[in-house]
């Protein structure tokens, strides 16, 4: 065997070894289905795959702020330079759209179901006016936008909902907005993250904490990440907690576009067992608005 062939076979052996190591690592990663946004486009990807699939609705671009419910999809999207709120029934292959109001400036930070309706955290301004923040719920049956004014206590950062109640912060304390619109301070904290199964996840002193809404007690999540390592550009959502897992994007300062950055990567934490994993298919992408659809 010539020296050149030896080099070639050595390189092939190294490549195969690296591939085997990567495959073994990805098999060890918890099997999650993750939805996330990059530059106002939404993708669906398995935590054990390097391949992503863009979520699309025929006739619309920049599908974002996605919520998936069985075979139905709620989202915002662009068409002809205008924003629309969408309800897409995949089984029936039908789409209902509600046009957004045209403002000089508008932005949507988050989406969730509230009182049975697709609802977004909405910021806008017209002309020289100061920006205003509120919730906008969409009545797809009557094709209407319903604006919901919120108290100042919950408007300083991210807003989350369990479908009936609203949770937010004033950067010092966490507040609950009840169904009767009464406001209650529940604990110290700078940012809410998510709420499920009567547990509210939030940030306090850079730590991931949880508040039991039934017992009205709080505690630090022992196996959680140091959230100071994850930039949270108010009130964008670069991480979430769902199904006992944390998924978050660690941003790097070496950005070369609005959606890509050297040394940026996404991590997965198993909060029950204290294990950390790398989301292999998302290296270099600035991702936000994560959803964990299921954990097998």
PLM features per residue range, with description:
Residues 39-61, 81-101, 130-150, 173-187, ...:
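Surface-exposed loop/turn elements that mediate protein-protein interactions on large endomembrane-trafficking
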Residues 4-7, 66, 70-72, 116, ...:
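N-terminal cationic leader/targeting segments used for protein routing and processing
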Residues 33-45, 65-78, 113-126, 160-169, ...:
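Short beta-strand elements that form the blades of beta-propeller/WD-repeat-like
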Residues 19-35:
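Membrane-interface motif at the C-terminal end of an N-terminal transmembrane signal
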Residues 189-196, 200-213:
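Eukaryotic tandem repeat interaction scaffolds
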Residues 61-70, 103-114, 152-163, 188-198, ...:
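Repeated scaffold domains used in trafficking and secretory/extracellular systems
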Residues 1-19:
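N-terminal Sec-pathway targeting helices
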Residues 68-69, 79, 83, 89-100, ...:
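Generic signature of mature, soluble extracytoplasmic domains
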